[in-house]
């Protein structure tokens, strides 16, 4: 397992060997006798997997699996599992944290208040930056899987118009699906 995995909790199931960050060349050597590999961003392709003759399982502490040669694993009977939806809401929420920070100047207003400028102001509500609302604005979402659809739901709560592009055909209430170029 890599250093992002709680090895102490896994040791009840068998011998656990934990490594820090490895170079690509070190990975093949380290997993040669492994039955199972649990990792996050470690690249596991034919070059790093071909010596792992006992390998039966790769577990990913990640939503994506683009770092794994899925076809090689399929041909060699290696099961691959990811954590497909573990961060869906956190990522959608963070998307709006960034939108609100950028669009509403949250950091600048927080500094304005912390520096005492709000209190010293001669007006009731000193607006250093324009007040912007998300209502009525349009958001474009590329990819409408679990994260994209969660972002759309939050956008709808802000009364935004939602446009989305997805490679495969999808439908969702209140979402207009358009081509990538149109988006």
Where are the regions that the model predicts?
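Rossmann-like dinucleotide/phosphate-binding beta-alpha-beta segment
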Residues: 12, 125-183
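An anion/phosphate-binding loop that grips the pyrophosphate of nucleotide cofactors and donors
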Residues: 34, 52-55
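N-terminal glycine-/charge-rich "phosphate-binding" loop or analogous flexible N-terminal tail
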Residues: 1-34
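Rossmann-fold NAD(P)-binding glycine/threonine-rich loop
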Residues: 66-78
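Structural alpha-helical scaffold elements that stabilize or flank donor/cofactor-binding regions
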Residues: 10, 29-30, 48-51, 182-183
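Phosphate-binding beta-alpha-beta segment of Rossmann-like dinucleotide-binding domains, i.e.
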Residues: 76, 84-138
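Short beta->alpha connector loops at strand-helix junctions that form conserved
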Residues: 20, 40, 61-62, 78-89, ...
């Amino acid at each position: 397992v890599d250093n992002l995995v709680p090895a102490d909790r896994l040791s009840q199931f068998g011998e656990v060997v934990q490594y820090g960050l490895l170079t690509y060349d070190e990975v093949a050597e380290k997993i040669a006798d492994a039955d199972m590999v649990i990792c996050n961003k470690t690249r596991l392709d034919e070059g790093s997997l071909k010596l792992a003759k006992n390998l039966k399982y790769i577990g990913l502490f990640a939503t994506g699996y683009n770092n794994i040669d899925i076809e090689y694993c399929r041909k060699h009977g290696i099961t691959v599992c990811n954590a497909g939806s573990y961060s869906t809401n956190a990522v959608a929420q963070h998307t709006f944290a960034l939108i609100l920070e950028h669009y509403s100047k949250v950091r600048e207003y927080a500094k304005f208040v912390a520096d005492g400028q709000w209190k010293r102001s001669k007006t009731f509500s000193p607006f250093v930056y324009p007040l912007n609302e998300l209502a009525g604005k349009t958001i474009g979402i590329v990819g409408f899987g679990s994260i994209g659809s969660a972002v759309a739901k939050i956008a709808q709560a802000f009364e935004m118009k939602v446009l989305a592009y997805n490679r495969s055909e999808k439908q969702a209430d209140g979402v207009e699906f358009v081509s990538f170029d149109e988006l």
